[in-house]
Amino acid sequence: MNSTASTPSVSWWRPLAKVDRWAILAIVIIPTLLFTIPALFGHPAITNDNLIQNFPLRALVGKIMATGHLPLMNVYINSGSPLLGGLNAGAFYPLTLLFIFLPPQVAWAINLIAIYITSALGMYVLLRWHRLSPVASLAAALSFTYTGAMLGQLVHLAVAQGFALIPWFVLVFLSLARRLRDLPETATLREIVGRVRTSVVWFAVLLGLTFLTGEPRSIAEIELLGLIVVPSILLIRSSYFLVSWKKRASYLLTLGVGGVLGIGIGICQLLPGWAFIGSSNRAAISYWFFGSGSLSVKWSALFFIPDIFGGNGAVAGPGYFVNYNLAEVTSYAGILAMIGFFAFLSRLKRKGWQGEDKDFVLYVVVAVVGLFATWGSFTPLGHIFHGIPLLKSTRLQSR
């Protein structure tokens, strides 16, 4: 193939091959067994912040809504504290509604299973869209889902819920660009709307779900993802590059419409949450506080060897022996991801990546920007990240 711009759009799922069906079955079975078997023996995955915040607050939401009332107030904290506005309960997230009808631990297990199916399936579908083989796509999907932040942030349910949607967001961004690329330059407004309406719906739903998680860090991560991916799609010449300004404008307008609809879906959580944050100490975060959770550049070795500074002391291993919270360093991506990343870097030629390799340059950009975001105030670029709305109100970049 001489030009990535001529890459045809391929619906790999029509028909769904047998190997794809087996891969999807594995994606469903693994988290189902992982979370149900320990729970059946009295060891549900409820620890740390999930134990003291996320699980009991969701159980409280279910109890309140079962009586026919909205989950507006938690009367059991101090003299009362906002429950919906407090965000941690994820009160209107669709799967939180299961706590109304099911025993809390059962509803919790279903939530966890759904997160990890969503994550792995999203990465699998994204890579199959990129025309990678089923085996490679499955390996990458499992590596993404069961290493790094997806596994390390299991103790923060809503963070994991937001992270699980990342592959789906990238897929929407890329597929929308390719849909518009395939349109003739003479396409009418009706033809453009007909081509992009599916992407509008998907983007709105994904954005709405992110808002409904009630997790500012998930929302900020998706914000940062969009700020990286969308400009990269518009600037990097690849199979989804949009040549004309008309198509670029249509691309941005489509995302804008989807964004407005997504805000409409999540507005019931956004408004009380924003009001609550506005009256808290998170309303104005200093640069020092913002950067207090940044990862020192010299500790980037944790990306490759997560226990290089010790671990939890299990199985005669050494305990953690540096002055930082081990649980907050969750960037380990796994050996498969590292091999794949450096193998791709080895294909770089003097004139850059060539052919279909250009489609994956986007992920190098994400990795580089992600590194600087993780290092935060340890680099001069930390001030740039502190200037991004919403992101500047979060901390713990090492997550």
Where are these regions (language model features)?
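Membrane-helix boundary/interfacial segments in multi-pass membrane proteins
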Residues: Q153-A160, P318-V329, V369-R399
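Structural signal for the C-terminal ends of transmembrane alpha-helices
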Residues: L34-P38, V170-R181, V230-F241, F342-W353, ...
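Membrane-embedded helix bundles of polyisoprenyl
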Residues: V28, T118-H130, P134-R181, T188-I236, ...
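Membrane-interface helix-loop-helix junctions at transmembrane boundaries of multi-pass membrane enzymes
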Residues: S239-L253, L326, F341-P380
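Transmembrane signal-anchor helices characteristic of membrane glycosylation enzymes that use polyprenol
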Residues: D20-Q53, G258-A275, V369-F372
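Active-site lumenal/periplasmic loops and adjacent helix-entry segments of GT-C-fold
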Residues: I37-H130, V135-P167, A301-A327
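Periplasmic/ER-lumenal interhelical loops and adjacent helix-loop junctions
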Residues: F55-L72, G258-R347
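Start-transfer (signal-anchor) and selected internal transmembrane alpha helices
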Residues: M1-I37, S239-V243, A249-G259, E356-Y363
